[in-house]
Amino acid sequence: MRPYSFPDVGRCWIAGCLAGLLVFGWVAPTLASDASDAKSVAPSGPPPQDALTRSGFEHYYDLDFETAISDFEKVLKAHPDDPFAANHLVSAVFYCELYRVGALDTSLYATNSFLAKKKFPFDAKVSAQIKELMERGLALSEQRLALDPQDVQALYVRGLTRGLRAEYLALVDKAWFAALRNALGARRDHEEVLRLAPDYADAKTVLGVHYYVAGSLPWTVKAAASLVGLGWSRKKGIQYLYDAANAGGETSADARIALALFLRREHRFDEALAAVRILIAAHPRNYLYALEEANLLKDAGRGPEAVAAYRKVLATGRQGNVYYHPHLEMAAFGLGEALRGQNDFAGAAGAYESVRQASTADSDLVESANLAAGEMYDLLQQRDLAVKKYQAVITANASSPSAETARRHLKEPYRNP
């Protein structure tokens, strides 16, 4: 094996951080506040919310991004000098676009496979808006810190915006060095927040993710990471996330979903399910939370329950009045995987076939679904259908790993391992 280079450190670090912070959003819902607020007694969390900010975040966590953006635009207009208001709006715009392009599927981040994925196709105008709002938020934070370097709220929101920029640079620009610098800046800001205000539990969400990620790196990468001052502890990371989740603060939901993802990696499925079910109870219109419950049941080996959960998600999504713009192709593919695990090859083939019928389906997911459907047809001894699926995979992207697998299956029918 070749040794890890510095780019590997950045890629592995960002991969883990994105896994914890990206999937369901990382943002601090707070009331726009004046800089004078920061000089009071050390705060235990972000400032309280106003009615419009609360409304924005209710819509945000329901995945009704359009309404959330409208609310946050009004807040920023009323408080143009507040870095929190800028952070809220850019977060909603960014995650709205990520959701549109199918980048919030947890399956992408359960492993590091997304590192090799092509850039997500962001709309150019949206990208420009995101960059402008991030720069505005950072500038407003810096203005407050210039007046008071120990302004806890300014440090906190600067850390949030730096983290958001790290996600954008990694996913959209694939700029790993720049993403790593911003991720480290976010971590250091929130470490300083806890030093100045030890009861500021919301800062533990970011730090919990970072500590867990660093503790999960290969030892060779840890050695390189230590050169830039990165400590690590998976146990401490998970405990920090539990602390933030149980504190009931502004990042409680974000801490729970990071917990669910990391506990899934630890095979602590019951704990992960408990975290997700709390989120579902609080936000029953959030399609991704419901999908994550089904994913966890599948990964836990609870096949029949997973099948039922995926079917419930699909049925609810097709009603058209519960979830906002659900990417049902994600649930269809998950259903195929769950049915495959139950040796229901005909049912799995049907589920995989339905993936390409969704207008929102990502081309990579369609490719994976076609390959999987072909394998099911081979197991069902329907070779003609299998061959058509393999040919479709190769036609879509002849240089992909799926195409290489499809070529092997064209030479020899797929058989169950």
Predicted regions mapped to residue ranges:
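Canonical positions in the second alpha-helix
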Residues: V75, R144, V193, D243-A244, ...
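Bacterial N-terminal signal peptides
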Residues: W13-W26
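TPR/TPR-like (Sel1-like) alpha-helical repeat modules
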Residues: R187, E191, Y212, G229-S233, ...
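"A position-specific structural signal for the A-helix of alpha-solenoid helical repeats
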Residues: R54, H88, Y95, V157, ...
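TPR alpha-solenoid repeat register
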Residues: A85, A154, A203, A255, ...
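Short solvent-exposed coil/turn linkers within tandem alpha-helical repeat scaffolds
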Residues: A78-D82, L147, L196-A197, G248-E250, ...
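Short coil/linker segments at helix-helix boundaries
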Residues: A35-L52, H59-D71, D81, A92-Q150, ...
